[in-house]
Regions:
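One-carbon transfer enzymes
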Residues: 1-116
Length: 116
């Protein structure tokens, strides 16, 4: 049985998947999403849809600018010792060294073809 799940996602496309996991009792230990961005008009800071639903569901979330060469996030994920990670249109390439940090690997759900 899964005890710790990492969820990584950013757009609206990822929200129903995160909500379904949460509502069905899956143990989401942490959510990764893109950091808030300034909009073009008025320079208002906008959170990603996954960021917003994570706050609503009271889930721990992290918004690193990049995972590449990010020792803090690497150590955090290593210590978390998660069973699996579910990635839904996260918006970052996940470094190989991070892909090795879960017991059962990463599952990627993507709405379009991935870059080669």
């Amino acid at each position: 049985m899964l005890k710790k799940i990492i969820f990584m996602g950013t757009p609206f496309f990822a929200v129903p998947i995160l909500k379904s996991l949460y509502q069905n009792g899956y143990p989401i230990s942490v959510v990764y999403t893109q950091p808030p961005q300034k909009s073009q008009r008025g320079q208002k800071i906008n959170k990603s849809p996954v960021h917003g639903i994570s706050e609503t569901l009271n889930l721990e979330f992290r918004t690193p600018v990049s995972l590449k060469n990010n020792k803090d996030e690497y150590e955090y994920l290593k210590e978390l010792n998660a069973d699996i990670a579910i990635v839904v249109a996260y918006g970052q390439i996940i470094p190989k060294e991070i892909l090795t940090l879960t017991k059962k690997g990463f599952i990627n759900i993507h709405a379009s073809l991935l870059p080669k």
